[in-house]
A protein has these predicted regions:
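C-terminal catalytic region of ATP-dependent kinase domains
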Residues: 122-171
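Conserved ATP-binding subdomain of kinase catalytic cores across diverse folds
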Residues: 1-88, 97-110, 117, 122-127, ...
Length: 171
């Protein structure tokens, strides 16, 4: 979480982390496809990370992450006061659930499960976050076309699948 020059707080997605630029591209594409479909996604912005950012950080691993992320990164507008979506405690409209499952099948998002829903409740609305693990085919370029066009069996683990009864209507 970082304060930006525009006075807002953002959740930074570091270029130097994990899958590096691929995850940021997936985050941007997945989030904007969701937004285009009418789903709620926090504002995505490009964030310039100055070389002085985190210089006083004592943890060497975090220092390495920050050094590897100097320059252009991606950030999501922080939804202050939001809470994690809990499928046990909260009800979701079946049509909305179907839209989200359809989106995650389309972008092959493996990361919206019961353990980690990657959804927030903010101002009584459901918001989607964290699309960095989307576009699964990008992680295995051998047979990429077959992988991109083939079935997506991991969708069986989707947190909203049990209530997504309107998939035909959404499709």
């Amino acid at each position: 979480l970082a304060d930006a020059d525009d006075g807002f707080k953002y959740v930074l997605k570091f270029r130097g982390a994990g899958q590096r630029e691929k995850a940021l591209i997936a985050e941007l594409l997945g989030g904007e496809i969701a937004r285009t479909l009418g789903l709620k996604v926090p504002e995505l912005v490009f964030a310039q990370l100055d070389s002085a950012f985190g210089r006083s950080e004592g943890d060497e691993e975090i220092q390495d992450l920050l050094k590897g992320s100097q320059g252009l990164n991606l950030a999501l507008h922080f939804l202050s006061g939001s809470i994690n979506y809990d499928p046990v405690a909260m009800s979701t409209d079946p049509y909305l659930a179907s839209q989200i499952v359809w989106l995650d099948m389309f972008i092959t998002n493996v990361d919206r499960t019961f353990r980690n829903t990657n959804m927030l409740i903010w101002n009584r609305d459901l918001w989607l976050i964290d699309h960095g693990a989307s576009f699964l085919f990008q992680h295995a370029w051998v047979n990429w076309k077959k992988n991109a066009e083939g079935p997506f069996p991991i969708i069986k683990n989707h947190v909203l699948l049990p209530i997504a009864s309107e998939l035909e209507a959404v499709n």
